[in-house]
Amino acid sequence: MPYNVKEIVANKPSRFTAGHRMCAGCGAPPAARMIMRALKPEDHAVVAGATGCMEVSTFIYPYTAWTDSFIHTAFECAAATLSGTEAAYQSLKKQGKISNTTKFIAFGGDGGTYDIGLQSLSGAMERGHDMVYVCYDNGAYMNTGIQRSSATPKFADTTTSPAGKVIPGKMQSRKDLTKIMVSHHLPYVAQTIGYMNFKDLYEKSEKAIYTEGPTFLNVMTPCPRGWGYPTDMLMQINKLAVDTCSVSYTHLRAHE
């Protein structure tokens, strides 16, 4: 069904609001805003945020940038916490104690997803919980000082893999987490970029949220501090990432 993304943005309320403390030029806030806009207006959402840039900058008690329910979890626990929340919701719904439609969405950075939280993510996906896990991937542990993660590209310069005379940056290749999630035989897996093709991000978010069962979105979200670009260059950095095939637009449904 054809539609105009500009009309969607204009007519749907923002569930990720202004007033957060994310850095200027960060790719994560516009990605989170568009993902949350993919929800139907009448549906409620429970969001779990793993400790990281997005959580510490958008949910500082008593302030929040989220209009839906939000759970702050430890670095490694977003998928586990949300899977338990979803299971409790399903139980209460079967008992007739609640009737509203609630969607469950987890957000974690690449450090909390590729590395520290991979075990709980794999478990939640394998068990078949009806939830979406979103990895906002900026290629390193940016919140704690730009340390390398398994999402960091080979030869990238970080504080724990400094490019210089001894080593030319990170020596290991980047982990293909999207392919790992595909191997879990999920009903929907997608990869995209957070700030350039909003139509692609919106459509993939909508499919992930409204496909029954566990789904996964891997969204590249550049970081001006870690990547070293001027804050007004976010759009150009995203375009370069696509043009140079650093990130690819991919998605896979269970029947494909």
Segment roles from a protein language model:
Residues 55, 138-143, 224-226:
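Short gly/pro/ser/thr-enriched loop/turn and capping motifs at secondary-structure boundaries
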Residues 235-249:
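Gly/Ser/Thr-rich active-site loops/lids in small-molecule metabolic enzymes
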Residues 50-52, 219-222:
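Short, well-ordered beta-to-alpha junction loops that form the rim of enzyme active sites
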Residues 2-133, 146-156, 170:
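Cofactor-binding active-site loop characterized by glycine-rich and histidine/acidic residues
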